């Protein structure tokens, strides 16, 4: 296997592991509670610790397929047909696109529920416009409720849905709420129904971590959590001390894994740049200037090339 292919395989594996750890961290109830407090009207102003108990069960992380016909699964218990999220047969359904995180939240009235989906994006995709994908996801979360959350024509039982997209490495910090509105063209008839069923939150995280103030509170938390620049101690200090989030062992482990993997990804990328520049005839001094590596470090990377090929 040649060097470029080896590096590509290694990078893909590292990025996959990084993505898995990132989703597990985002899927922690304490983190999800902070997201809900800043994005869902009913929870705004609440203490995130009080919202944790509203999150029902364990959030499904990378298990529920997005594809029509596969989001739900039926089972039978005591002669009764039950329909829920499809979280089984991951091997059979390997390769399917899945929701990053999806879960139910019990509202403050203790009766109604909403469905929350959280998606993490390292940057804006090049092959399609991200808002179009978000619209598809939120539409699937609405349509898949049939037979799971309501039956036949009981459309009044449709649960409200939020699809929250956390987009990293943006030029600026931002947050937008995309939702349905009614525009009267002729007359002003009040059509019955709920315009608030479908909600998309686009949350942009700037490359630079914002200061801790009320406006950017959520951006700072998620920015620190997902940063590829901060050390483990810096991340845990912000998350634990500034946001009073309990740092349990599995949480600390995932933060550690993410930090190690992100450093590995950066190192692999730099090594690939160095090798490509060397092949194109750049001098060691020129490569050192561009990559901010010492000449001795560059020589070590270049010397490894024949052995890896």
Locations of the language-model features?
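Generic structural signal for hydrophobic core residues of well-folded globular domains
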Residues: 39-40, 105, 167, 206, ...
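Accessory alpha/beta interaction modules
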Residues: 1-199, 211
